[in-house]
Amino acid sequence: MGDNLKVIEADSVSYDYPDGSAGVREVSLEIFEGDRVGLIGANGSGKSTLILLLAGLLRPTKGKIRIFGREIDKKNVEEIRRKIGVVFQNPDDFLFNPTVRDELLYVPRQLEWSEEEMENAVKEYAEMFGITHLLNKPPFRLSGGEKKKVEIASVLIYKPEVLLLDEPTAYVDGKTKRLILKILEDFKGTLVIATHELDVAEKLADKFVLLNLEHRIEAAGGKEILKNEELLEKAGVI
């Protein structure tokens, strides 16, 4: 999907859940530096599973995932994961620190940023997402839209090279959705977004992978996929 450095490669990847149900089947794709890829499909097509596989958070049942040319193992897992930011569909799966400020600083503290660097970053991203007034509040007391903004801010703050997003605009109001999309449009790294919202996919991506309800790739290509109603209907998207 490009001429630059290959960032993520999936080679005939399948994943089965412990109960035997299929996550994805025989998925192969290549994502290059600077790519903006939309994983589109109906609910249950395997988009979320594929995001977790591409992030190295699940291990394939079959096939291989390579990130920056390497399979993840105990020796390189921390190094690789610091280059990748993952935004989960449900912020409650991610937010666990006592305050919003602590959420924003969780990774910077692990990376041993200076106090000045951390304070400057908190100020920048809190203002960017409109959450300055929430910095001292516990995340569990926030609304769904506020939680989503905190989650995305806490990933972007450490400037990952690759951003993997699972339904980043789900369950938010129109104003919050527009803010999130504007910020993600400005992200300069490699971006992969899983979504069933075609307008979101079209706004953030220029290359697309369509997953069908058999958990396989139905098609891959450019924005012409979004205009092919027959193909989208076959995959259960419309």
Swiss-Prot record:
It is a peripheral membrane protein. The keyword Methyltransferase does not apply. Signal peptide: none annotated. Pfam families: ABC_tran (PF00005). It is an enzyme of class 7 (translocase). GO terms for cellular component: ATP-binding cassette (ABC) transporter complex. InterPro entries: AAA+_ATPase, ABC_transporter-like_ATP-bd, ABC_transporter-like_CS, ABC_transpr_CbiO/EcfA_su, ECF_ABC_transporter_ATP-bd, P-loop_NTPase. Residues 8-238 form the ABC transporter domain. It is found in: Cell membrane. Its EC number is 7.-.-.-. Transmembrane segments: none annotated. Belongs to the ABC transporter superfamily. This is Putative ABC transporter ATP-binding protein AF_1841. It comes from Archaeoglobus fulgidus (strain ATCC 49558 / DSM 4304 / JCM 9628 / NBRC 100126 / VC-16).
